Structures are given as structure tokens and as C-alpha cells.
Regions:
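Short beta-strand/loop motif that positions the catalytic acidic residue
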Residues: 134, 140-142, 146
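Short, surface-exposed alpha-helical segments at coil->helix boundaries
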Residues: 3, 97-101, 151-155
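Conserved alpha/beta-hydrolase catalytic His-Asp/Glu region
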Residues: 58-63, 74-132
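Conserved alpha/beta-hydrolase "nucleophile elbow" surrounding the catalytic nucleophile
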Residues: 21, 25-30, 143
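Flexible "cap/lid" loop of the alpha/beta hydrolase fold
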Residues: 31-81, 87
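Active-site loop/oxyanion-hole signature of alpha/beta-hydrolase fold enzymes
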Residues: 1-24
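Residue in the alpha/beta-hydrolase core beta-strand immediately N-terminal to the catalytic nucleophile
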Residues: 22, 45-48, 132
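Catalytic histidine neighborhood in serine/cysteine hydrolases
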Residues: 151-170
Length: 170
């Protein structure tokens, strides 16, 4: 769950003897940052949340179950094509094939159990209704063509966190 991942974050901060930090989270890291700030905002000076979301729509949850089942049945290789297409626009894939290849290798190297646990946490993500309680300077960053976490998902977070700014990268 995201609560367990937030626990891991707090454990890391404690282990590094960091009482307060400027937190930067990308994708799932942004989800973890939201969950952690909801639990103990005093640990953060600011949040920077990139290419993330605060809620997975009900209609998208079955897709996460499908990904979990595919990983368990066929391994991570089976997820590579659809993940690349979800994470990168066709234009980016064509222009930056070298970078996309690095991500393909990262996906292939991901442990199935770790993926399945994180995918279940993402599937169950539903923080939007609580975000208005976050009183931290918050920077939201998203690419305008991000197919996985669209600008609209960041606009929802922006509307909920009063002291937030949204930057859309062309």
C-alpha cells in the first residue's frame, strides 16, 4: 500500500537523520509524497510532484489488475511494449530511442513481486479528497503529451492544494 511505502520513506529520512526535506517524487514517487505529506507534513519543507496522480479512476483499475496478472503469468518482459507506449509519446520514442531503451531494460530488471505490490498500490490510489489538508508549497510538473499521467490529473491536484503551482512542459 502507499501507507507502507510512506513508512519506508519516513524510515529512510530517519536513517539519514533528515528531519525536514524538500521532497521530489516522480510518478509513483509523487503518489508516495502525497501520502506521506498527508500523514506528517511537518517532515517536508516543500513538495515537487512530477508526472503523477492523486486518484486512479475506477474504470482504470481493471487495467492494473491485468498488468499484475500478466507480470505474474508471463514475467516483466510481457509488460515492456505497453508500458513504453503508456510512458512515452510516439514522438519521444522516435527522437530519443537511446533513452527509451534504458527504460526498457529497467522494466525488464524489475522484480515481479515488487512490481505487483507497487501496481496494487497504484491501482488503489485515492487521495484527492484529502489533498486540501496539505499546506506546503507544492510544485507540480508534467509533460503536455504525457500519456500516463495527463495534465488533467495535475490540474486536479492543483485545485486541491492551495499553495501549489502547475508547470506544463511543452
Amino acid at each position: 500500500t502507499l501507507d507502507l511505502l510512506a513508512n519506508d520513506l519516513f524510515g529512510l529520512l530517519d536513517g539519514l537523520e533528515l528531519n525536514q526535506v524538500h521532497y521530489i517524487g516522480l510518478s509513483m514517487g509523487g503518489m508516495i509524497g502525497q501520502a506521506a505529506a498527508l500523514r506528517d507534513a511537518s517532515r517536508f519543507l516543500s513538495l515537487s510532484l512530477c508526472d503523477t496522480s492523486s486518484r486512479i479512476p475506477l474504470e482504470a483499475r481493471s487495467a492494473w489488475n491485468d498488468r499484475i496478472n500478466l507480470a505474474q503469468g508471463e514475467g516483466m518482459e510481457a509488460l515492456v511494449p505497453s508500458t513504453i507506449d503508456r510512458w512515452f509519446s510516439a514522438n519521444f520514442q522516435a527522437q530519443r530511442a537511446d533513452e527509451v531503451d534504458k527504460v526498457r531494460e529497467m522494466i525488464r530488471g524489475t522484480a515481479v513481486n515488487g512490481f505487483c505490490g507497487c501496481a496494487a498500490a497504484i491501482r488503489d490510489l485515492d487521495l484527492t479528497d484529502r489533498l486540501s489538508t496539505i499546506d506546503l508549497p507544492t510544485l507540480l510538473i508534467v509533460g503536455e503529451d504525457d500519456p500516463g499521467t495527463p495534465v488533467s490529473a495535475h490540474e486536479v491536484i492543483r485545485a486541491c492544494i492551495e499553495n501549489s503551482e502547475l508547470v506544463v512542459i511543452p
